[in-house]
């Protein structure tokens, strides 16, 4: 069955990246947002069951140190503007996960920005990356799935804000209105 769905912005995927995009768009306001997921439930890297997240504090020293570590890690070949945004937005994670989504973090490892990059750690998107911030170990449920629980709660929050979710719905074609 073919169906046309109209939206201002379409997000493909309901994993960490897709949900992050939907969250930022919903909070910008004034947009009709549709999130499409080809699987019957939320997917993406969340199926790898992350039990922690990294957050670079929003201080000049921490932001600069994390940026420099990730720039060197990529041999300065990555999209440096994107790295800057990722590091900056990661400072919002504790507020979102702990306060808004009510995910518990029984242990937080606060890191000195001068030590960023000196040991392996769970960093943004890299399970064996270089640590570039504070590490929050989060409670899961059942066999784990701490981030899956966070993203499920985020989905419920976004649905209340009017974001539409379509599961088992791979996108077949995008029709752009050039208004």
What are these regions (language model features)?
Residues 32, 38-177:
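Conserved N-terminal/central alpha/beta ligand/cofactor-binding core
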Residues 7-35:
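N-terminal Rossmann-like FAD-binding beta1-loop-alpha1 element of flavoenzymes
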Residues 1-6:
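A short, basic/flexible loop-to-alpha-helix module at the beginning of a structural domain
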């Amino acid at each position: 069955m073919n169906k046309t769905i109209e939206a201002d912005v379409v997000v493909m995927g309901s994993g960490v990246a897709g949900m992050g995009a939907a969250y930022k768009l919903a909070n910008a306001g004034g947009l009709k947002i549709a999130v499409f997921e080809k699987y019957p439930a939320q997917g993406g890297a969340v199926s790898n069951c992350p039990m922690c997240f990294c957050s670079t504090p929003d201080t000049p020293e921490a932001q600069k140190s994390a940026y420099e570590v990730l720039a060197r890690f990529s041999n300065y070949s990555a999209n440096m503007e994107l790295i800057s945004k990722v590091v900056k937005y990661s400072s919002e994670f504790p507020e979102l996960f702990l306060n808004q989504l009510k995910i518990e973090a029984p242990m937080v490892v606060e890191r000195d920005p001068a030590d960023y990059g000196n040991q392996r750690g769970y960093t943004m998107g890299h399970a064996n990356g270089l640590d570039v911030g504070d590490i929050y170990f989060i409670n899961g449920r059942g066999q784990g799935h701490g981030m899956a629980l966070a993203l499920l709660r985020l989905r419920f929050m976004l649905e209340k804000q009017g974001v539409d979710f379509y599961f088992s719905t791979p996108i077949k074609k995008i029709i752009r209105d050039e208004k």
